[in-house]
């Protein structure tokens, strides 16, 4: 058998074409064969014999690396080579036939979930909030009043389709239990998972998803006892005792349901946007990516908080300061010009002639267009969503059909997080598909930012003055992260509402004039000759008190 280099150097070694092919086809087949030979030569080959040794010695198989072995370029028909190939094939067969099992003894390793998609189908979404408000109204104590005013995080009860038998370490930050249920309701007090949470745990290997063949009343009795399925899985007898056929029949773990594969979990839990009990593939990929990065992620409320209607456009005009001296009071008594910063004249100069002591009044005259600084730009404003302020916004763009909505609230790992009382989110995530969504318009971005609560800059940035100007502008007063999903490749883009109208740069000019040190006083002249020479007076004055000039030369006797 010729080597690849021989085929390239001597074309005569190429097998002749068949009689049914033409010369052109023969040339093409030879070139194709040459390309395939080169690709096969360059392709990395894994020696599964090296992996077989680690397979038999350690349990942490996933932590080991399959290394490449030495590769023979051709078969030379020896028994040693045939034995090596057979050993590698057997090792590959053992690796591919490995059965992945869950560790039932470890509380952090395994948990079983049951798929009940229609259990919360007709349940009111605000059930917990209604019960909390009712309990606060019936109670008379201060604690009850606080409970009545407390807002619970969104439960999304109609989308919770997976019921957990018990919790483990992986599911401590996932799932919610529906409180306030009647005592005779099955599975009372147990935690339910959203589709993205369940699928994430299945992929992670921490959840075994089962399809129930019995009703939820049989799997999870209403008396709150141990679930029948869990009792069937864990035998009441000890490991050393002999089990009879009757015990094995009673403890049949497949009596109440069947386990589902990962493909079946994807088919049941992945769907279109707005489909109850399912999540889109783009949102699940973003959720899974953030969870694997160590963040805590919860779903955002479907209906955001009510929009404040009292938000109005503000201008950069500042109210006139009150006179603080007799001179300024007398000047203020003089008749003023008919024009004002808020009502400019129809013709003539924007800045009327006069005497101005600061740049503030001049720039207020030049400020004709109103600024769109929201009321959230003030540190005393409420942390509530605002009404979109763009007068040109199209209602159809900011309606329910717009894809630009907040889908997830994200918390850093260092943030103290609880599922029932989560703190304000560190990030607001909007998931966008790069395939189906175009570049957002101004009205869509304005509506998206208006749906997010105010996120003011840090206190030291607000009090930092001009030195912290760029930090305040970069952070903004509202910000949302767009998670652009391009067929599984996720990029994050940050959109913020910058407070440019709040940064009045002309005030810095007044600070320099009024706060700068004064240097002045005319200097005496320099004498020369005898002691009775007289120097001339230098020229003083200037802005802020000028520096005295150099004196003239005196006359001697």
UniProtKB/Swiss-Prot annotation:
Keywords recorded for this protein, A-Z: tRNA processing
Keyword check for tRNA processing: yes
InterPro entries xrefs: tRNA_splic_suSen54, tRNA_splic_suSen54_N
Sequence ranges of Gly residues compositional bias: 517-527, 538-549
GO-annotated cellular components: tRNA-intron endonuclease complex
Keyword DNA-binding: no
Region (Disordered) residue spans: 1-36, 131-152, 225-252, 370-403, 514-557
Biased composition (Low complexity): 370-381
GO biological process, one term: tRNA-type intron splice site recognition and cleavage
Pfam family, one: tRNA_int_end_N2
Biased composition regions of type Basic and acidic residues, renumbered to the chain: 131-140
Subunit note: tRNA splicing endonuclease is a heterotetramer composed of tsp-2/sen2, tsp-1/sen15, tsp-4/sen34 and tsp-5/sen54. Interacts directly with tsp-2/sen2.
Family: Belongs to the SEN54 family.
Function field: Non-catalytic subunit of the tRNA-splicing endonuclease complex, a complex responsible for identification and cleavage of the splice sites in pre-tRNA. It cleaves pre-tRNA at the 5' and 3' splice sites to release the intron. The products are an intron and two tRNA half-molecules bearing 2',3' cyclic phosphate and 5'-OH termini. There are no conserved sequences at the splice sites, but the intron is invariably located at the same site in the gene, placing the splice sites an invariant distance from the constant structural features of the tRNA body.
This protein's name: Probable tRNA-splicing endonuclease subunit tsp-5
Primary gene name: tsp-5
